């Protein structure tokens, strides 16, 4: 179990270590002063048609922009690079865009606000970097932010912050550490914001040591802890949550995926599981744990669940385990097990390499799923991308790719966006045909892509946000 919960974390460790970011020092200091506090000047709506306010667009995590009308299959081939924004650290968080402002977290420890029209930086706030002696790599901001009620919500290390959208000043901050060695506690993933609360999961740093995984619900206005849920019993470690919580507002449900556990029994509590919880109390409703026949060493769920509708008012969600099997569940009957599943790779502890953990996208009855190391028709590929009927699992199309896909998929107006290896790609949703590609200088696409208002925003581990348009 040496590599537990590392899926997302191991992938980050591998990326940053390869880039030498382990030794990166603070290069930028906020001119605002990170301990200053002020109230937001106004309350922003959840989203207008021109906003992308959450990781994968919304807290349902479908990765689809239903309001895109400019980009389409007829003009995607005409995309060109329009501008870039550089920070002193790698970018593995998805850019969030609200009211024409881009909110981008960087591994240099800063949250940046950038005007999407003028391309000028509006503010930056240094939240810091974290590291422990047992892991060789230090990190800044790894998770994607969320924007709501005039605040930017983001975690760094074991502290969760709310920043004023207009100036970046800290409105509130809350420590969520459970382990007395504070550096062992990390908020890796993106938050969900709903029901007047911010939901965020806690996991360990590099599994050295593991900690007890916890889901927190914080008051959106004050940051006070409203509720919490432990994924494994007291006395155990593991069950960390390093993906984003998914929200079903219609049923008042939070859905999370959890990591594995170290102590005997090897799968205690709700470790290595998908879990549904009440969004007010965080009391567990149901969970399903990977069965012994499908378990691998380090059997984490590293992907964020994708929520989608079904017939008869039913709601389903799909999620990848690091065994490279994609599972789909009936939300109302999770404990009964998946309604369908498909294996798309060899699986393993090394997320993004032989284990799949990219979150899927959903639109109009189709799931778009990217797997890791696989063999198709006798040929080995670093990854694959495919389309599946969301209710039956029927394969619609699938291609093997030479580069690894780390980031979650994005869709908009008939287009599918992915980053494989060092290549940003735009495909036709209907058949997977490649419409546009752009190759970066290095193996550099690890953050999810944002497609909004005719522009495509691609975060890169070469420290730049690349922006494409017609």
Residues of each region from the PLM?
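Sequence/structural signature of beta-propeller modules
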Residues: 25-73
């Amino acid at each position: 179990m040496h590599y537990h919960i590392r899926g997302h974390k191991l992938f980050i460790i591998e990326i940053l270590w390869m880039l030498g970011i382990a030794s990166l020092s603070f290069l930028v200091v906020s001119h605002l002063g990170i301990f200053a506090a002020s109230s937001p000047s106004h309350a922003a709506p959840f989203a207008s048609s021109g906003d992308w306010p959450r990781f994968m667009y919304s807290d349902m995590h479908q990765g689809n922009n239903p309001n895109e009308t400019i980009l389409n299959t007829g003009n995607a081939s005409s995309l060109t690079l329009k501008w870039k924004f550089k920070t002193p650290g790698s970018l593995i968080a998805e850019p969030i865009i609200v009211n024409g402002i881009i909110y981008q977290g960087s591994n240099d420890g800063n949250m940046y606000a950038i005007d999407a029209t003028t391309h000028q930086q509006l503010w930056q706030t240094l939240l810091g970097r974290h590291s422990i002696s047992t892991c060789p790599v230090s990190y800044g901001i790894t998770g994607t932010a969320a924007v709501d009620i005039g605040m930017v919500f983001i975690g760094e290390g074991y502290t969760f912050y709310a920043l004023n959208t207009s100036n970046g000043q800290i409105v509130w901050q809350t420590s969520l550490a459970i382990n007395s060695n504070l550096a062992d506690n990390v908020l890796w993933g993106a938050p969900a914001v709903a029901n007047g609360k911010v939901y965020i999961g806690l996991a360990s740093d590099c599994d050295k040591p593991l900690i007890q995984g916890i889901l927190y619900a914080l008051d959106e206005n004050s940051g006070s802890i409203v509720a919490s849920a432990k994924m494994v019993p007291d006395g155990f470690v593991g069950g960390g949550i390093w993906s984003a919580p998914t929200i079903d507002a219609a049923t008042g449900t939070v859905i999370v995926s959890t990591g594995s556990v170290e102590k005997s029994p090897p799968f205690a509590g709700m470790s290595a599981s998908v879990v549904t919880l009440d969004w007010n109390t965080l009391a567990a409703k149901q969970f399903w744990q990977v069965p012994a026949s499908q378990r691998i060493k380090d059997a984490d769920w590293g992907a964020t669940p994708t929520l989608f509708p079904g017939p008869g008012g039913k709601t389903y969600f799909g999620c990848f385990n690091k065994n490279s099997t994609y599972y789909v569940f009936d939300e109302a009957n999770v404990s009964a097990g998946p309604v369908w599943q498909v294996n798309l790779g060899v699986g393993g502890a090394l997320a993004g390499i032989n284990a799949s953990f990219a979150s899927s996208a959903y639109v109009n009855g189709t799931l778009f799923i990217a797997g890791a190391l696989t063999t198709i028709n006798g040929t080995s590929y670093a990854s694959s991308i495919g389309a599946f009927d969301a209710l039956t699992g029927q394969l619609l199309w699938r291609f093997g790719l030479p580069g690894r896909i780390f980031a979650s998929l994005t869709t908009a107006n008939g287009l599918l966006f992915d980053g494989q290896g060092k290549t940003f790609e735009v495909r036709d949703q209907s058949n997977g045909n490649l419409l546009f590609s752009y190759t970066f200088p290095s193996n550099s696409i690890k953050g999810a892509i944002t497609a909004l208002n005719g522009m495509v925003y691609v975060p890169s581990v070469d420290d730049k946000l690349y922006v494409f348009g017609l």
